[in-house]
Amino acid sequence: MPKRDLPWRSMPGTSKTSRNANYSPRARIGPRVDKASEWVHRPMYRKPRIYRTLRTADVPRGCEGPCKVQSYEQRHDISHVGKVMCISDVTRGNGITHRVGKRFCVKSVYILGKIWMDENIKLQNHTNSVMFWLVRDRRPYGTPMDFGHVFNMFDNEPSTATVKNDLRDRYQVLHKFYGKVTGGQYASNEQAIVKRFWKVNNHVVYNHQEAGKYENHTENALLLYMACTHASNPVYATLKIRIYFYDSLMN
């Protein structure tokens, strides 16, 4: 004698529910990921206590929002003797790219661009390394000092550059990196991408002047030094440098 069909089978438009179906709101809808990715992106409550207690604040201590930004877009001709530019030049004003008063804090620096060679230079068989130094000038005065006056080098080689002993209290190297380009007819690499993002938390102080110039700094100016290793072949760098800063509460 055949068994009688269950009630839900006789009702039109209904189907038996699968036991393997997961109707939880936390169920993953997209493609499944591996356990390593789940562990890296685990929620904060599953991480150790030190991750929750030592989180850095969005706004630096002693500052107020909103986060402001200043960009420096320029093409640089980098030679063996070096070059310097100030990246903390901010004009006084009320805009999103201006400082309100004398004091502000540069929270982070973003450097984006590329290093490239000229059409005539890239055909020569050579390798050229370009080095960058992000330096804090604690007591700026006058004009920025040249690369050779700040750094001590062996045999005038920029790859061996270190801050001179009598200037170590004034100039502090925060970060350093380099990029390499290679010239030649065959295995050449005539350009290299530059992409760096650093948290510096540098508190800059200006005088009573409104113009954003190095000569108006009184404390903690940010300088970017650049130099290449090849003595005769220069290198070009097309860079976009952005600083993200907050105004100080002491203004």
From Swiss-Prot:
Under which name does UniProt file this protein?
Capsid protein
Query: Keywords in UniProt for this one?
Result: Capsid protein, DNA-binding, Host nucleus, Host-virus interaction, Metal-binding, T=1 icosahedral capsid protein, Viral penetration into host nucleus, Virion, Virus entry into host cell, Zinc, Zinc-finger
Question: Which one GO biological process term can you cite for this protein?
Answer: symbiont entry into host cell
Stated family: Belongs to the geminiviridae capsid protein family.
Offer an example of a GO molecular function term for this protein.
structural molecule activity
Q: Where is the composition biased (Polar residues)?
A: 12-23
User: According to its UniProt record, where is this protein mainly located?
Assistant: virion
Q: How does it assemble?
A: Homomultimer. Binds to single-stranded and double-stranded viral DNA. Interacts (via nuclear localization signals) with host importin alpha-1a.
> Which segments does the record annotate as unnamed zinc fingers?
63-80
| Pfam families per record | Gemini_coat
Q: According to the UniProt entry, where does the motif Nuclear export signal sit in this chain?
A: 96-117
Kindly list the places in or outside the cell where this protein is found, as annotated in its UniProt entry.
Virion; Host nucleus
Report the SS bond pairs.
none
Question: Where is motif Nuclear localization signal found?
Answer: 35-49
Going by the entry's taxonomy, the superkingdom of the source organism is recorded as Viruses
Physiological role: Encapsidates the viral DNA into characteristic twinned ('geminate') particles. Binds the genomic viral ssDNA and shuttles it into and out of the cell nucleus. The CP of bipartite geminiviruses is not required for cell-to-cell or systemic movement.
Family matches, as InterPro entries = Gem_coat_AR1, GV_A/BR1_coat, Viral_coat
Q: Where is this region: Disordered?
A: 1-27
